[in-house]
């Protein structure tokens, strides 16, 4: 009996089972112990293969692929700390709902806890973060193939969101020519190999439940809060709120067109919050709210009912309002809860939103990161998409810009880390094939610098704008101790990215004014390559501009 041959047949069943659940993209890191999984993936024509040498970046690449494809994405890594590097992407997926299938190769049990090289305790290492965890036994013909395939089917068939960790121990030898070992074991699955459906089909019913008193509540004074949702949902939500005559407070990830722009500015005005206090119901569609003033208002508002509608399960209200947590697809929920044409009840807020936007426009000429955030809608590629980083940049765009309704916007706003942002953007571009504008800060770019290797392979123009404000300037907005702020919070690195781009043979530009930036963008959108644009700005100007605008708008 050939151990290596049966390892591969065992792995082939696992990989084929994944295809029955919509897995098309598979991300593979180099490794020896994962050889059976890697070769099985390579031999399966249903997969689109992606490779990367950095497992942390690989996990985020898979995350980006899953964001756009809306399908589960598989990841293959070898044993040891390679597995641990998938943790950040798994955590993010659990919070934002992407489906990741982590296939982690492992040493067999007799090599664990005995000093064997690259052998750690992998089963259960991700604690409660995976939706399902499977610790497979060592491949053996004593276990029928139908057990293996139905085990995979059960985990994936009941997966609504988040990650599945499948730990796969393999004994040596891992290499060798294929022989007849295990053919009869494999063939007991019969015509499943020619089919395209799971061996075990589980279809948990998830239907949106109609709120029978909706016809009562839609006649009341309401507010719509729009969090993270799809582009199509964003357009529908905007129309729904407009028909109801309810003010729509749209997050940067809502894709609603933010009909009341600069919400994080005007929510600092007492006239706005006073008017919002008249709301009898708040309907929040989507989670992951960004703006500080929005979160403060959300925490302090006290309507009679607070409803949160999101496809993700679990509690999504840190303010613990009295109301309803409705687990539903947003588009389906809107269809079940039609709007009734009513006149807008808010008078003050539309005026404040317009004045706030005019205050931002009055400052748009200076060459800075706050101004870039405001102008970002002018720089979006046609039929493209936007990927927004975390920390200060996403807050500036949320507060100062007005993105087009239905224009796709992606970000990692679950755990909101700055790790893996470039890798995620690479996955977003690969899955969509669309022109992509990505914008991150300098520390975020440094954190994921390895991912520039992924940006060498794009199918459409990708522009990466690195806003270099020399450190974590978001801490300038927080009451950090001034004497220790630079050393322990901002951590300026005093670096530029020209040589990083050159190392990966990416085009690089460092514009000095808006005209140079716009000329660079026009050229960049013409060719299916990556262009790195480093925008060097004064350290604290972005944070100071935001603070000045907040003060100005609060006194309107």
From Swiss-Prot:
Binds 1 thiamine pyrophosphate per subunit. The keyword Nucleotide-binding does not apply. Its cofactor is Mg(2+); Mn(2+); thiamine diphosphate. GO terms for molecular function: 2-succinyl-5-enolpyruvyl-6-hydroxy-3-cyclohexene-1-carboxylic-acid synthase activity; magnesium ion binding; manganese ion binding; thiamine pyrophosphate binding. Its EC number is 2.2.1.9. Belongs to the TPP enzyme family. MenD subfamily. Homodimer. This is 2-succinyl-5-enolpyruvyl-6-hydroxy-3-cyclohexene-1-carboxylate synthase. The lineage of its organism: Bacteria, Pseudomonadati, Pseudomonadota, Gammaproteobacteria, Enterobacterales.
């Amino acid at each position: 009996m050939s151990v290596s041959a049966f390892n591969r047949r065992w792995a082939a069943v696992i990989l084929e089972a994944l295809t029955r659940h919509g897995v098309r993209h598979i991300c593979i890191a180099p490794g020896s112990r994962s050889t059976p999984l890697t070769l099985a993936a390579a031999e399966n024509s249903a997969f689109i293969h992606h490779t990367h040498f950095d497992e942390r970046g690989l996990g985020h690449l898979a995350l980006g692929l899953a964001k756009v494809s809306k399908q589960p994405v598989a990841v293959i890594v070898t044993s040891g700390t390679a597995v641990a590097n998938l943790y950040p992407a798994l955590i993010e997926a659990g919070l934002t709902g992407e489906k990741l299938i982590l296939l982690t190769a492992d040493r067999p049990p007799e090599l664990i806890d005995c000093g064997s090289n690259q052998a750690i305790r992998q089963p259960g290492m991700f604690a409660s973060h995976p939706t399902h965890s499977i610790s497979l036994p060592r491949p053996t013909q004593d276990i029928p193939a139908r057990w293996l395939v139905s085990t995979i089917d059960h985990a994936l068939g009941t997966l609504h969101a988040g990650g599945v960790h499948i730990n796969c121990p393999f004994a040596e030898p891992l290499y060798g020519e294929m022989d007849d070992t295990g053919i009869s074991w494999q063939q007991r699955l019969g015509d499943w190999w020619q089919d395209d459906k799971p061996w075990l089909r589980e279809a948990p019913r998830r239907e949106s439940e109609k709120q029978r008193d909706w016809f009562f509540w839609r006649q009341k004074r309401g507010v719509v809060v729009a969090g993270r949702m799809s582009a199509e949902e964003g357009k529908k939500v905007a129309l729904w709120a407009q028909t109801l005559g309810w003010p729509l407070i749209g997050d940067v990830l809502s894709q609603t067109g933010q009909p009341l722009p600069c919400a994080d500015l005007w929510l600092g005005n007492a006239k706005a919050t006073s008017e919002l206090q008249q709301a009898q119901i708040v309907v929040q569609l989507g989670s992951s709210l960004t703006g500080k003033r929005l979160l403060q208002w959300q925490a302090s508002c006290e309507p009679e009912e607070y409803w949160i509608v999101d496809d993700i399960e679990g509690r999504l209200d840190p303010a613990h309002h009295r109301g309803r947590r409705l687990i539903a697809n947003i588009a389906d929920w809107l269809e079940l809860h039609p709007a009734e044409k009513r006149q807008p009840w808010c008078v003050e807020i539309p005026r404040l939103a317009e004045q706030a936007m005019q205050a931002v426009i009055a400052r748009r000429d200076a060459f800075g990161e706050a101004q870039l955030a405001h102008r970002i809608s002018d720089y979006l590629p046609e039929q493209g998409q936007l990927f927004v980083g975390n920390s200060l940049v996403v807050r500036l765009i949320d507060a100062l810009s007005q993105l087009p309704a239905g224009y796709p916007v992606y970000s990692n706003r679950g755990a909101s880390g700055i790790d893996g942002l470039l890798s995620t953007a690479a996955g977003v571009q690969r899955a969509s094939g669309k022109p992509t504008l990505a914008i991150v800060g300098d520390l975020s770019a440094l954190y994921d610098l390895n991912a520039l290797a992924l940006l060498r392979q794009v199918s459409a123009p990708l522009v990466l704008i690195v806003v270099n404000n020399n450190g974590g300037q978001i801490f300038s907005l927080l009451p950090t101790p001034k004497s220790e702020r630079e050393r322990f919070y901002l951590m300026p690195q005093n670096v530029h990215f020209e040589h990083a781009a050159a190392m990966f043979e990416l085009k690089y530009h460092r514009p000095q004014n808006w005209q140079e930036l716009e000329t660079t963008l026009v050229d960049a959108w013409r060719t299916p390559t990556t262009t790195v644009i480093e925008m060097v700005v004064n350290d604290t100007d972005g944070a100071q501009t935001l603070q000045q605008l907040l003060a100005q708008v609060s006194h309107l």
